[in-house]
Amino acid sequence: MLFILILLLVVATIVSTAYLTEKGEALAVRTNYQKCHYDIVHENLPDLSDYHWLYDLLLGAFVAPYIFYYGTYDAGAVGSVWVWLVVCVFIFRCLTISVTIPTQTTHVKRDFGNWLKRHLTGTAHDLCFSGHVSFAFSLVLVGLHFGIISNRVLWFGLLACLGLFSAMSRSHFSIDIVMAVPIVMTFFDWTMCQSASKDTIFGGCDCAPDIITM
């Protein structure tokens, strides 16, 4: 199930890339090459960059259930999740040094906070994929899998709001948010399968698909 979903996402990515490339070239000509990319959210929804701080505040809502959770954590499960997060960070690092966005990001300036962003949690010119959405999606999947949270509609709805707001606040391009989903799902499935002593990444392991489809 998850393997089929990822294949569909790959096809959708190829088609959307071709479409957005064409739109981007037209936009570059129309604006005399002042803008050489096209983003469906940036071009059609309001600019909320002045409310960028709400982006981090909304992420805090995903952390809260873990702070107030009074149950017992399984040490093996926690170890598996840590491995999964490290793999995601490794993939993120690989992408940030190899994927260059077409225009300079205006929110990166040479002050202390953004210096940390460039050297530890992000870069000055590369944003793929969204760390906020990846982390929030990870918390939702872990919470549902281990019973820390239960309302799927609420949390996936809140996750969609976080993704939309991250694009509207100009923190990310839309593709950064979309790419976070298959990456997190793939490595969540892999780590849960490994913790359950499965031999394959997708075959025989139904932990991630159950969370998504139920």
Regions found by a protein language model. Name each.
Residues 31-36, 69-81, 147-150:
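Membrane-interface helix-boundary motifs at transmembrane edges
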Residues 116-204:
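Membrane-embedded catalytic cores of phosphoryl/pyrophosphoryl-handling enzymes
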Residues 200-214:
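Non-transmembrane, juxtamembrane loop and terminal tail segments
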